[in-house]
Structure formats: C-alpha cells, structure tokens
Amino acid sequence: MASSLLEEEVHYGSSPLAMLTAACSKFGGSSPLRDSTTLGKAGTKKPYSVGSDLSASKTMGDAYPAPFTSTNGLLSPAGSPPAPTSGYANDYPPFSHSFPGPTGTQDPGLLVPKGHSSSDCLPSVYTSLDMTHPYGSWYKAGIHAGISPGPGNTPTPWWDMHPGGNWLGGGQGQGDGLQGTLPTGPAQPPLNPQLPTYPSDFAPLNPAPYPAPHLLQPGPQHVLPQDVYKPKAVGNSGQLEGSGGAKPPRGASTGGSGGYGGSGAGRSSCDCPNCQELERLGAAAAGLRKKPIHSCHIPGCGKVYGKASHLKAHLRWHTGERPFVCNWLFCGKRFTRSDELERHVRTHTREKKFTCLLCSKRFTRSDHLSKHQRTHGEPGPGPPPSGPKELGEGRSTGEEEASQTPRPSASPATPEKAPGGSPEQSNLLEI
C-alpha cells in the first residue's frame, strides 16, 4: 500500500519534495515530512512508517492539514505546526473554518493535483494572469519559456506587435512589427506596409522617407493663385499715358517737382479744379497746357500757383499737415515746408552762411542780410550763389524761381527799393 502510494505520488508530480520523500522511503531513513510533523514533540522518536503518517494526516484533517499531507495519493502543502487541541473547544477551532476529512471516494479532478505538468498548472495557479493584462504577452512568454499559449480567446493587446521571442531582431517579416530604421538587406522596405493586427485607419509608426505616390499628385488646395505674388502697377492709365507720349504736355507741365496727389493710384498729377478740367478735356486742351495754372479748390481762397508743388505746400497750410519734423535732441518741432525746417535747424547749429561784403557781418537768413544792407544805403549783393536761397514764409528751398503768374507785391510800402537788391521779395506769397 505504501509503495503504491509513493509510486502514485512520483507518477503525478515531479516536485522536488515529492521526489525527496520517495528517495527517503526507499533508503529507509527518516522522512522530512515526518520530521516537520513532529516539531512540537521534542525528544520523542519513532521509526518511520508510511501508514502512521497517513493515519496522522487523517486525524488532523479536521483542524488543519499537516505541512505535507497525503489525500488520495496527493500531496498538499500546509503552513504552520499543529497546535494542542486541548486548549480549544470543539466549537471554536483554531482557524475560522475547518476542513472535514474525506469521508468517501472523491473525484481526483476536484483536488489540485501536485504532479501535473507545468503547462497545465500555470493557468490555474496564476489565475490573475489569465485575465487581459497590458503586459501579459511579455511576461507570459518568459514564464512559459517556449510553451505555446492557450486558445486565442484573449484579445491581443494593440502594442503586441512582436509575437515572436526576439522582438528587437531585424529578421522578422515586413508586415510584422515596426520597420527597422536601417535596412538590413539590399531590398528596400515597401512604402506603406499594412500591419495585420491593425485596422486600416492606422498608419505605420515610422513614416516612409519619401511620400506616397498619391501625395505627390498636385492638389488644388495647396496651389496658391499666382496673381497674389504679382507686383501691383505703380501708376494708373492716365499716368502711363502722360509719361508714354499720349499726353506729353502733362508730364512736361509738372516737371521734376511732381504734382499734388500724383503718387496716389487712380489720380492725376494734380487735384486742383483747373487740372481736373484739363484732364477731362484731354487732347482738346493741349493749347491750354502750355501755361498751366494750379488754383486752390478751397472755397473762399482762390489762390493760383504756377507749380503744383507750390499748390501742394499751400494746401498743407489749409489742412494743418506738418510732415517736416526737427530731429534735434529734445526739439521735435514740425513744419509745413522744408525751408522752414532748414531755417529752424540753423537756430540749433548757429550757422550763419550769409555774409555782408561791406562789414563782414554774418546772418542766418538772406532776408536778414538784405535788411542789414539797407542800413549801408547800398543795395546788397544778395546771397552767395553757392548756398540755397532763403525765401519768406511762402517759398521752399527748391522753389527759388519766381512764379509765372503775376502777383502783386507783398510789401507795397517799399517801392523805392532797387531792383537788384532782393528780387525775390517782390514775389513773396502770403500763405
């Protein structure tokens, strides 16, 4: 009986403890199972017998199993040494639940066998690992060590792209796993590898070094209209005609100074009523363009100028525009005309460029020099030809010529002045 039980134990299981028990029983020595069951009884020794161990395990089955008890030829481990039963009543066993001994023939399949193969015991022992786990496929491969997994009722995780063992190796198929960053063979990988475990909506993690052919086709949404980058025309048709030859007198009348508002798109060279009328008449008014007259369109003003630049400066006086700013430190004054700004800058620099030939006095303005020369009783020589002429309030630096339109003298109280003294003072414009 004992030999059959031991043979059955060796047959069912291959654990080291079962093999050690069988070896000890063959040599007739003391069994470690027997020694562990008799830890509480110091000083007592009994000869080893298999029947005594089996009977002891059956009697102690009510309280708790021995460290290694045998039931129906199977070994089941237990945790602690036996406690004396005299200190406890039968109603209150040492543990919260008692396990009754086997009363009849039980199905061996109901008990956990000790000697089954590792491939059968792992799913039952590691019951928590059988559930869907994020990293189940990784550590299961290490535990089973080559054992094929169970039936494929558990869904494969989405990152489990390497069902093989060495997932870092480059010898796997092109459709399985990630593409290698460096090709191992001479053949290049395909442009769009389709992963078998992925739905069609997902793209590969490593994009191809060059786009797919359908991306190389020109699409209308990426093409910008070329007229966006076309340079805009500088002038309108009227300006092109005036500069090209259809209206040459118009370009000749403005000269180098340019007309008022001529730089704006859709405008003629001047916005005065006379120029607008000549623009409307076109070629019929070619004779009138020889002596252009630019009049102020402000109601109640009616001033007329021979140059569009003079009219432009005059209109700044009406609008209050002061585009010329003094850049001197802590000054920042603004002026309507450039000659006014130039005179103002001389007050900062203390420059006196006009010199009297009789007494060698120097003045910052030409009109101051002319006034000083009258004290000598002789007509002044005028400003030197090298420097720009200084005018009154109504003239600019580049507008030294007298107006072609006759104007009454601005200072009628001094008619006895010699004509060579200061010819520009007779044509001063009051602005």
From Swiss-Prot:
Domain of life of the source: Eukaryota
Biased composition (Polar residues): 403-412
Annotated spans, Disordered: 30-56, 71-115, 154-260, 367-431
InterPro entries recorded: Znf_C2H2_sf, Znf_C2H2_type
Post-translational modification: Ubiquitination at leads to proteasomal degradation. SP7 is a short-live protein with an endogenous half-life of approximately 12 hours. Propionylated. Depropionylation at Lys-371 by SIRT7 activates transcription factor activity and positively regulates bone formation by osteoblasts.
Biased composition range(s): Gly residues: 166-178
Chief localisation class: nucleus
Domain statement: The 9aaTAD motif is a transactivation domain present in a large number of yeast and animal transcription factors.
PANTHER family associated with the record: KRUEPPEL-LIKE TRANSCRIPTION FACTOR, TRANSCRIPTION FACTOR SP7
UniProt protein name: Transcription factor Sp7
Organism: Homo sapiens
